[in-house]
Amino acid sequence: MKDSFLFTSESVTEGHPDKMADQISDAVLDYIIERDKKAKVACETLVSNGFCVITGELKTSIYAPMQEIAREVVKKIGYTDALYGFDYRSAAVLNGIGEQSPDINQGVDREDGEIGAGDQGLVFGYACKETQMLMPLPIHLAHQLTFALAQKRKDNTLPFLRPDGKSQVSVRYENNKPISIDTIVISTQHSPEVSQKHLKEAVIEEIVYKVLPKEYLHDNIKFFVNPTGKFVIGGPQGDAGLTGRKIIVDTYGGSCPHGGGAFSGKDPSKVDRSAAYAARYVAKNLVASGVCDRATVQLAYAIGVVEPVSIYVNTHNTSKYSSAELEKCVKLVFKLTPKGIIESLDLLRPIYSLTSSYGHFGRELEAFTWEKTNKAEEIKAFFKH
């Protein structure tokens, strides 16, 4: 009997208020970590109507010009006119950063050279064979659409587009394999003079049909482009934005569980971020090695403790190996202490602004070391013995 269902994921553009906040937090992190690799950073950002607040905790020896960093991010996104809902030149930027608690730091920086986890927490990694990047198809397509919205705006192909926007893609599955796109929702901020008819036609022709894979397109796709009508007021003028409010967009679009911890603004001693990257690295290499078609990996940590307190691997009935065998392999092949993760993935680099929009996973950029499949052969060798 054929098992058929729909699964939906969403993405947002770099001009979405929550993503603006993520990008500012990660730009602050990058500025600091480039100059002080021993820094501890937990940077949170709020953007609202005409102002930005940067807060959180730092332990660093260098000065970071918060105002300049925030304004440069907002300018790069494209909020260059108050008519867009925010202007990088006139917006107020308030700095409320404080010092990291020494109670936390004593458990992280240890005398034996190891690094304790910066907090307790559980994280998940995921990989599957639905795309070349070993990502779920719905989130992959949703990111392609929002990235294209930004590119078509910036290169002036669709000059009436403005920075804020979202996408949502519903994919039809049969027997756990994606077969077609069912519904596409795109909401995009725009200039007041463009008609909704022209906007919809342009978005479908210039973005959807030029970006999405032909094998999933068909004549019966349901399109909803700005379904409520006009979307002129957007960005922080329309909605406040906060760091860490798009954690499902940042990860797998709901295709696997989420531990609840956000990524942006956190240095890699925070396992919310670094261990989530490691969990993706593990899951992707398991799938790339051929020992399974799909993998969900959970890692859990205790504050100040070096080794993970638990490792869990679920291959969703796509592997001939047991969870216990797979866990044994993972422990042998991967370094999953905070220090091991930081060193093996080379995380003390200013790479985090690249992650802060269009997904932390499934993008094969050179800086994204957790996307490499260089452990696949070791995994194969483990199961040959």
Swiss-Prot record:
EC number(s) from the headed UniProt entry: 2.5.1.6
Lineage of producing organism: Bacteria, Pseudomonadati, Campylobacterota, Epsilonproteobacteria, Campylobacterales
Reactions the enzyme catalyzes: L-methionine + ATP + H2O = S-adenosyl-L-methionine + phosphate + diphosphate
Organism: Helicobacter acinonychis (strain Sheeba)
Record function comment: Catalyzes the formation of S-adenosylmethionine (AdoMet) from methionine and ATP. The overall synthetic reaction is composed of two sequential steps, AdoMet formation and the subsequent tripolyphosphate hydrolysis which occurs prior to release of AdoMet from the enzyme.
Binding site for ATP: 16, 164-166, 230-231, 239, 245-246, 262, 266
Name by which UniProt lists this protein: S-adenosylmethionine synthase
Region (Flexible loop): 100-110
InterPro entries: ADOMET_SYNTHASE_CS (IPR022631), S-AdoMet_synt_C (IPR022630), S-AdoMet_synt_central (IPR022629), S-AdoMet_synt_N (IPR022628), S-AdoMet_synthetase (IPR002133), S-AdoMet_synthetase_sfam (IPR022636)
Residues that coordinate or bind L-methionine: 57, 100, 239, 270
